[in-house]
Amino acid sequence: MAHGEPYYSSKPDKDFNFGSTMARRQMTPTMVAKLPNFVRNSPQAYDWIVRGLIFPTTGKTYFQRVVVITGGLEDGTYGSFVFDGREWVEIYPIEHLNLMSSLKLIHKANALQERLRLSQEEKATLALDVQFLQHENVRLKELIPKPEPRKIQMKWIIVGAVLTFLSLIPGGYAQSQINNTIFTDMIAACKYSTETLTENLDLRIKLALANITISDKLDAVRQILNFAFVPRAHWLRTVFYYIHYYEMWNIFMFVLAIGTVMRSARPGTDLITLATSHLSGFRMAVLPTIPFHTTMTLWVMNTLMVCYYFDNLLAITLAILAPILGIIFLCFMEDSNYVSQIRGLIATAVLIAGGHACLTLTGTTTSLFVVILTCRFIRMATVFIGTRFEIRDANGKVVATVPTRIKNVAFDFFQKLKQSGVRVGVNEFVVIKPGALCVIDTPEGKGTGFFSGNDIVTAAHAVGNNTFVNVCYEGLMYEAKVRYMPEKDIAFITCPGDLHPTARLKLSKNPDYSCVTVMAYVNEDLVVSTAAAMVHGNTLSYAVRTQDGMSGAPVCDKYGRVLAVHQTNTGYTGGAVIIDPTDFHPVKAPSRVELLKEEIERLKAQLNSAAENPATAVTQQPVVTLEQKSVSDSDVVDLVRTAMEREMKVLRDEINGILAPFLQKKKGKTKHGRGRVRRNLRKGVKLLTEEEYRELLEKGLDRETFLDLIDRIIGERSGYPDYDDEDYYDEDDDGWGVVGDDVEFDYTEVINFDQAKPTPAPRTVKPKTCPEPEAETQPLDLSQKKEKQLEHEQQVVKSTKPQKNEPQPYSQTYGKAPIWESYDFDWDEDDAKFILPAPHRLTKADEIVLGSKIVKLRTIIETAIKTQNYSALPEAVFELDKAAYEAGLEGFLQRVKSKNKAPKNYKGPQKTKGPKTITH
């Protein structure tokens, strides 16, 4: 194959074609057969290198070329091999960047294909398991016996009918049947009239004697309500007419018997209890005691009530002896059953004895019924918190629990109705992200972690002292490095580069700890629990049943944002440590340079204090212990204000002392010196030294404020170059120069605190024949301003040559005030378009001071261009320039004139002999 077709090991190798084609042509069958184990379907780079560069060679063989192949091996390494005539020998790897990038992509693709294959196999296995489970589910459903419709036995229907018949008997008093005749009707009418007259007479006597009782008042109110709210012909009167023959117990037992037959799980026991309570006469007093009974004590109560029907004294004796006998003969039971049985026997004794007393004294058991209800209510109010009694042994282990919630042995269908009742509340949804969870596996055990940002967050005790941990995510295992562990029980693990979670959790910006959600992996199953939490400093506590492996789980709010990291495991309660954004990064310790700077500042402060109080500094002795003094906030504020006032005063004095040479009077606005080059402009001169500049910055003056102050000073003391033209002078055009006349400003001046002072180029000054002495600078008296102006005008008229004016004080305005005559002309579309510059060409001062007026003028300009009516434009521009003049800014009409028209007597740029600038 020498000098034949190029050799390619695979299609990707041919597509990439890395290296030398000549080297590929040198491949022989022997070389191909002995090739190293490169990655299948991967490219290689072929090089044809001089032999002497690889092997120690002398003579003519030095310049012979050999084939070198570089590629990725199956063991994951990268290497280069050269053929020495017999076999391939590994040499130092040659770096081919494109080849290395391609191998990385191929390796990643192979890894993804392997994951896909494993996932597909797992999916097929799970699908098969699901099918098996579905078949098993169907088979088990067929084995479950179908519930048959409930059938009520005929004997219970007969017993219920008998009880219903007994309850419908009005009473035990028989009434004789009387034949109604005209005489009997007259007797009944007379009897009714006599009773009514008697009631009226009694009422009048009571009113006369003022002997009205509370019962009389209640009867009167009842009659008023009866006649006021119930009409004379109403169905309620008919119902009450028939009901008043029956007692309340009869009606209640009728309803209870029907409910027992229809809904009770044990109708026989319930109906027998109703029958015995009716026969014994205890009636309503029996019902409140039923929750205290067990099955055995319930039958004891029924037996004693039947015995009471025949012999009340025997029943009372047995009822009193029942608790004593139960304590003795039931001691073989376990504690929980023993307590329940004794409690039922005591309730039976109270019922029999108290019921007999009430029947003997009052003839009814209503008072006993009220007493038992009151006791139950008090007991219920005192045990609202606890839900069970725990019985413990000597070691403190709970061996049994007795629920405080009373369960009925009889008539339990009410509780079933309550359980199947209508819900009264709606629970809120919570957001969970299972894709953000992973399992942290260490030699000590397993824990839960979650992805947040570029880290995996878990509990520090789940990581232990390990530097590297295994992260299990979606069935795959990754090795990750522990990045940082703060003082809290939290660990931050760097997320591996090839691990890409489907979801990440974010920290809560506004934490709400009222309701928290804990989600974790336990035995490869996702568990989620929601509970109310309490904050204890930097920790949370909540009632959640926790298990091993939940350490490091996220504790989130209802929106799925992280609040804390789950920590403790007590079985019934959970705890977590609150996580903050500051916990993600370690607090950097100050460097040695920063510590030295702080020490220097402290020493400077001590030196300044010693300089201010030299006597104290000399006589002060070192004190071993310092007295602690309590200082209020107001004292601290006063001290800070005093210190700031002193520092600002010192700062003002220093600035005034430094800038005093530059705060000089300005020259008057004349045209006498236009042809003369101004001197002493101090171009490129440093206004302050670097030490003074830093000192001002340390005093509290920031850089931006300081630069603004320097710009203002420059604007007050410098301006455009002024030339002296002896041949030109116009008294009427005294206000010609607008830009640069009232403010002397040199745009070429450079403020530089680091560069050296440039050397100004020499200038040729036009000699003067009759120089006049300059007058000394005097402060301007505002009261004599008009007189000086008149004198100045007279001197200008008399002189044959323009003279210099006296320096004028600094003015906050720019140029001359706008005059209406300058704006009163015929405006056209071009004038309207170019009167305002583009928005990006406006200065910051224009936007701040004239922003609203500029927007208004733009609106007027747009309207004028659309309607071709420019009558309102002059007044608007005049108002804008007037506002600009008052703010110390240049008018916009003046800017247009300055831009379109060069200044008079402009002689072009000045010629200097400075260094040339070479541009590349």
UniProtKB/Swiss-Prot annotation:
GO terms for cellular component: host cell membrane; membrane. The chain crosses the membrane at residues 239-259, 286-306, 313-333, 344-364. GO terms for molecular function: 5'-3' RNA polymerase activity; serine-type endopeptidase activity; serine-type exopeptidase activity. Keywords: Covalent protein-RNA linkage, Host membrane, Hydrolase, Membrane, Phosphoprotein, Protease, Serine protease, Transmembrane, Transmembrane helix, Viral RNA replication. Residues 783-795 have a biased composition (Basic and acidic residues). It holds the Pfam family Astrovir_pp_1. It catalyses: RNA(n) + a ribonucleoside 5'-triphosphate = RNA(n+1) + diphosphate. The active site is at 461 (charge relay system), 489 (charge relay system), 551 (charge relay system). Gene3D superfamilies: Trypsin-like serine proteases. Cleaved by the viral and host proteases. The protease is probably autocatalytically cleaved. Cleaved presumably by viral and host proteases. Residues 800-813 have a biased composition (Polar residues). One of its GO terms (biological process) is proteolysis. The record marks 175-176, 419-420, 664-665, 755-756 as: Cleavage. Changing residue 747 to A: No effect on viral replication. Its EC number is 3.4.21.-. Belongs to the astroviridae polyprotein 1A family. This is Non-structural polyprotein 1A. The gene is ORF1.
